[in-house]
């Protein structure tokens, strides 16, 4: 369920079905990034329609689905292959998009010369050798795209799924077994951030995780503990990513938003990096409507939290998703689904509110009045000095008019 405390009316995207404006049109007006995971190997770069067209028309941020992972960029030790990652950069130039790099240190899609399964140390590398391998990889890959890739997922999915340790120690977390964690130790995370920052001091650095989206889960708490530790260690960490691979019926918007906001209290961004929402029951009559409502609810959270600067969906169309049961915004024929139209509607309404809320509502033909000051009140009518959450705004204009609105931030 949505939290019920939103400035937007109930999900109503009917009028958006006749609109030709893109998602990025509104996102850019709001200073937000709406992004997509692209698979460059599927595209005909001579074309501008179809899936490649949607990638550029609808989204102002792009991330390679697989192109920048370890096995793709360094298939053999010291031999780097940038064909796929360069293709993502080419697309970003063509469509004027911000680029996310994904990912530098992960337990999956590790080349066989490092590990046969991401866990085994088949070649009996020493700790020092593994650190050198990781360092060389990061300096080469990040260095190649210095000044071109805006932000990187430095480490991906480092936590074990079993975080029962949090129940006995609320500040604890447990790393998953991997070639990096088992044979180097936790310092591989810190080292990776240090090296990525050295390779490109201007790049924004993130850690990324799944299953840690909503407060109350042990993995969510463990992730918070780890991210807090990294921040307090003085590392150049911009924020954390929540993958948000959901199935309809799983989402609790209040718990998701509470999680995002507590990272803001740490001075960190908390962004949505791999959003998709699979249908719990594709045969249900209201399956697509339920999916649309959840996409809309997440979009509202994205829009009203300043530290959630980006929201990326993990793919374009249902037939090319890594998941079953139609989790994306476009169907197998590249037709927009209700989920797309509700994301569009929430972006549009946010822009409309932004553009109309800064002027006097008077329509008597006089020039718009200038806003003098805004006073915020909580739901009890008490003035707020640092407004967050549900609030009432009273806007005072130089023509004597006063506008009172309810909003959520």
Residue ranges and their predicted role:
Residues 391-409:
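C-terminal tail/sorting-segment detector
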Residues 40-57, 132-141, 218-230, 256-259, ...:
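Short, acidic/polar
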Residues 37-49, 70-83, 159-161, 212-222, ...:
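Acidic-and-aromatic substrate-binding clefts and catalytic sites of carbohydrate-active enzymes
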Residues 23-24, 57-75, 83-212, 279:
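Substrate-binding cleft and catalytic face of glycoside hydrolase catalytic domains
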Residues 18-22, 112, 144, 153, ...:
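Aromatic-rich peripheral "rim/lid" segments of glycoside hydrolase catalytic domains that contact
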Residues 81-98, 181-209, 216-283, 296-309, ...:
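Glycoside hydrolase catalytic-domain groove-lining segments
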Residues 2-7, 352-383:
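Residue-level detector of functionally pivotal "anchor" positions at catalytic/ligand-binding pockets or at interdomain
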Residues 8-61, 65:
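Boundary/entry segment of secreted carbohydrate-active catalytic domains
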């Amino acid at each position: 369920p949505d939290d019920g405390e939103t400035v937007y009316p109930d999900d109503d995207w009917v009028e958006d079905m006749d609109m030709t404006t893109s998602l990025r049109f509104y996102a850019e007006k709001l200073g937000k990034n709406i992004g997509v995971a692209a698979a460059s190997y599927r595209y005909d770069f001579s074309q501008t329609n179809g899936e490649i067209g949607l990638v550029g028309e609808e989204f102002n941020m792009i991330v390679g689905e697989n192109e920048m992972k370890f096995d793709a960029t360094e298939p053999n030790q010291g031999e780097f292959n940038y064909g796929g990652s360069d293709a993502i950069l080419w697309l970003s130039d063509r469509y004027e998009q911000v680029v996310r790099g994904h990912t530098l240190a992960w337990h999956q899609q590790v080349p066989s010369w490092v590990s046969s399964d991401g866990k085994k140390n088949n070649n009996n590398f020493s700790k020092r050798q593994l650190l050198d391998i990781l360092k060389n990889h990061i300096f080469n890959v990040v260095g190649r795209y210095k000044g071109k890739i805006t932000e990187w997922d430095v480490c991906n999915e480092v936590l074990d799924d079993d975080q029962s340790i949090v129940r006995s120690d609320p500040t604890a977390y447990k790393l998953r077994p991997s070639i990096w964690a088992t044979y180097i130790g936790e310092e591989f995370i810190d080292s990776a951030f240090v090296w990525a920052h050295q390779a490109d001091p201007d790049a924004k650095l993130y850690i990324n995780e799944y299953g840690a989206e909503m407060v109350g889960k042990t993995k969510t708490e463990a992730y918070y503990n780890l991210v807090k530790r990294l921040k307090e260690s003085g590392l150049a960490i911009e924020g954390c990513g929540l993958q948000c691979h959901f199935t309809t019926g799983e989402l609790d918007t209040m718990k998701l938003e509470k999680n995002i906001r507590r990272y803001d209290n740490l001075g960190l961004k908390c962004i949505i990096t791999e959003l998709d929402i699979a249908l719990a029951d594709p045969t249900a009559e209201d399956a697509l409507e339920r999916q649309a409502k959840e996409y809309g609810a997440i979009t509202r959270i994205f829009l009203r939290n300043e530290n959630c600067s980006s929201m990326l969906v993990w793919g374009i169309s249902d037939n090319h998703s890594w998941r079953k049961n139609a989790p994306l915004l476009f169907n197998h024929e590249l037709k927009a689904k209700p989920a797309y139209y509700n994301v569009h509607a929430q972006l549009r309404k946010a822009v409309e509110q932004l553009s109309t809320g800064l002027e006097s509502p008077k329509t008597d033909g006089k020039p718009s009045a200038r806003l003098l000051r805004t006073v915020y009140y909580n739901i009890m009518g008490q003035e707020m000095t640092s407004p967050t959450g549900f609030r009432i705004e009273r806007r005072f204009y130089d023509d004597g008019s006063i506008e009172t609105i309810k909003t959520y931030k």
